[in-house]
Amino acid sequence: MLRWLFAITLFSLGNLTPIHAEVIGREGQGWLERENGQLILHLKGSPREMGLQHGRLLKDHIQQNLKTLLEIKGNQALVDFGPLKLKPRTAIEAIIAIQRAHVPDWYLEEIAGLAEGAEVPEMDALVANFIPEMFHCSGFALMNSATADGTLYHGRVLDYATDWGLQDHALVLVAEPEGGIPFVNVTYAGFVGCVTGMNVHNISIGEMGGGGLGHWHGVPMAVLMRQALQTCETFDQTIDLYRTSPRTCQYFYVVADGKTNKATGMEASWDRFELVLPGVKHELLPEPVHDCALLSAGQRYQLLVERVKEQHGQITAESALKLMDRPVAMKSNLHNVLFEPQTTRFWVSHAGSDGTPAADRPYNAYQLSELLSRTPDRKDAN
């Protein structure tokens, strides 16, 4: 079960601390660097070009990641698919056949380029990129009077199978799509879609899933998130994209806009669209807290409510990070991200190779505007 936590809160983290970065590969307009142990992948160009850059610069990582996902773990697990229990690949191939009519050409072109560059079968790359459709999530949001200052903050906790080794292929992916909006995607080698991201127009988006398995006739969740980041400049445009697009299953989202200091949760399911406003009671959220949208379930939801109430009006950067500590973050905590959309700053922590939860590991600090200003020839990269 894939569970993801989101936070939107208001506070400020201090200045970014420059860290030595090393350029380790180039391909066309794309390039790869390593900073403080974290891979940062820069992609630029057409969908095909970006896919080729991704595949060639991270060929070994992609081959290893897909082998684990599709051959090793994919042959061990069974998933529910209607009344049947199927291996994940079999189920995903059936989903692809249903959803293909709703997948934009640019997405398939980028996956084809990635497969060519990484020297993997195109169907393997396609199946891996549809894995997020099998899983569902949870989340929370805090803002305005709930915090110590007025800076909009959007945080995210991803809990998912650290024993699958995704953290060994973790990326900060900085994309400049031809004709589109530049954005950052916190992701893994071989993945083209997005589940955690922010663009240069100060829009950040996160996803959390519910039920509705089997309702696949729509745009895949990770594709829709990626599309929003590279096409939407405003809060209203983002909401309208979700409202008007054919959707799948039951998904909840958090959308934040640093330009207007505005954020909301929303349900964008196959048959329902509803904004989940901060501080407003919802049938799934029985304990509303002023200026907060706490989207989670069970004991984790109760703990979030307790933590937020205890610090309401006093939440700072440090205390906001603590809101996402275990057991709000599960033992399988794969990555944590905090976005400050107004400044495009963000902080990332990944699980350790030994399975140490991301919440128990240090954060690396970045700023999207600064990442986009970098070149592989800059002196401070050597």
Roles of regions detected by a PLM:
Residues 17-21:
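Sec/Tat signal peptide C-region and signal peptidase I cleavage site
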Residues 5-15:
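Bacterial N-terminal signal peptides
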Residues 22-110, 114, 145-153, 157-382:
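C-terminal, well-structured catalytic/ligand-binding subdomain of enzymes
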Residues 114-117, 122-156:
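Gly/Pro-rich turn-and-neighbor structural signature
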